């Protein structure tokens, strides 16, 4: 793994933490539940792969999109 790859993954990990916190705050969830929703979301691989520059979207926007995907699947 290159230094650039390591930096990108560090940035993504920080983004995931902010998404988890935003989802917990917006929907009254525990951090554990928010983390579970994020890591099982079909959007996570798209964010990781940079599809449509999703990783550039705001944390709250992504938290809401992930929440909507979760509730629609329920």
Regions found by a protein language model. Name each.
Residues 1-74:
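C-terminal alpha-helical interaction appendages
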